[in-house]
Amino acid sequence: MTDMSAAYVEAFLEMMSAERGAAANTLQSYERDLEDARSFLRSRGTGLTDASADDLRSYLSHLAGQGFKASSQARRLSALRQFYKFLYAEGLRTDDPTGILDAPKKARTLPKTLSIEDVTRLIGQAEAEAKSGSDDVMAKLRMHALIELLYATGMRVSELVSLPASVLAQNGRFLIIRGKGNKERLVPLSQAAIRAMRAYGEALQEESADSPWLFPSNGKSGHLPRQVFARDLKSLAARAGIRVAAISPHVLRHAFASHLLANGADLRAVQELLGHSDISTTQIYTHVLEERLHDLVQNHHPLAKQAKKQD
């Protein structure tokens, strides 16, 4: 970036990191989005720090014309809102041009998920391979632990792969997860997840006792990259006879939430377990609640029972 935009964006990113605990991925996303907006505005002879509300509307219209989904437009507008709020708070602008902009309307698509039967097959495949004693047993123990932990807790894949090795010492029925914004939450573990983690942990102590990560690797981060886990998960799904296109770590997170709600869990409790700061994010799962209520009425309402008998 040129002129003062570079310095202001750098100061903004430093603030987001130091004061709000933004993760590296979040900071990179902000930087990319602000750079894209700056490039568009520069082509119109306007600087990023001097843009008006009309300039920013033109930018959003440009994104729509380029075929960006409403969710992608909304994400970039969110980055701009944060940036201009920072400039206003620091006295670097006398106004916030994003204050009068409407957010692009996002379609509330239902998340992909897996049936309980498919999850059972997936976990069963991972468990069988971990117990087979064949080659590369460490990788198979790791995959079994990853799958059990993900489905037991519903944590984000970034939270899963970056778990510290110290969780092995907790030796309890709960796991402390450090999520977005450095916020911590407590999630319960299933007995199956505890067993899988212990089996993997014992093997890990023999192979990588000095690593600070539960799932260490030789990569830059020091822990298993989420892309590697996603790739290995698809391979496992193929061996389990599950459609590869239907599987990803995020789909398992959705399965965790959907299966809990389908079996009577409270929406607020699921919100806490998922680490959603706003209940509206969790409300995308309300279709599960609607199906459960429909089944409840059909199976237990006296008139519905009577109609079934007549059929």
From Swiss-Prot:
Gene3D superfamilies: 1.10.150.130, Intergrase catalytic core
Entry superkingdom: Bacteria
NCBIfam families: PRK00283.1, recomb_XerD
Major site of localization recorded for this protein: cytoplasm
GO biological process: cell division; chromosome segregation; DNA transposition
Annotated ranges, domain Core-binding (CB): 3-88
Keyword Transit peptide: no
The protein's name in its UniProt record: Tyrosine recombinase XerD
Active site, UniProt feature: 156, 180, 250, 253, 276, 285
Coiled coil ranges: none
Compartments (UniProt record): Cytoplasm
InterPro entries: CB, DNA_brk_join_enz, Integrase-like_cat_sf, Integrase_catalytic, Integrase_recombinase_N, Integrase_SAM-like_N, Recomb_XerD, Tyrosine_recombinase_XerC/XerD
Pfam family for this entry, one: Phage_integrase
Gene Ontology CC entries for this record: cytoplasm
Limits of the Tyr recombinase domain: 109-298
Family according to the record: Belongs to the 'phage' integrase family. XerD subfamily.
PROSITE patterns in the record: CB (PS51900), TYR_RECOMBINASE (PS51898)
Keyword Mitochondrion: no
Role noted for this protein: Site-specific tyrosine recombinase, which acts by catalyzing the cutting and rejoining of the recombining DNA molecules. The XerC-XerD complex is essential to convert dimers of the bacterial chromosome into monomers to permit their segregation at cell division. It also contributes to the segregational stability of plasmids.
Keywords: Cell cycle, Cell division, Chromosome partition, Cytoplasm, DNA integration, DNA recombination, DNA-binding
GO molecular function, one term: DNA binding
Subunit structure as annotated in this protein's UniProt entry: Forms a cyclic heterotetrameric complex composed of two molecules of XerC and two molecules of XerD.
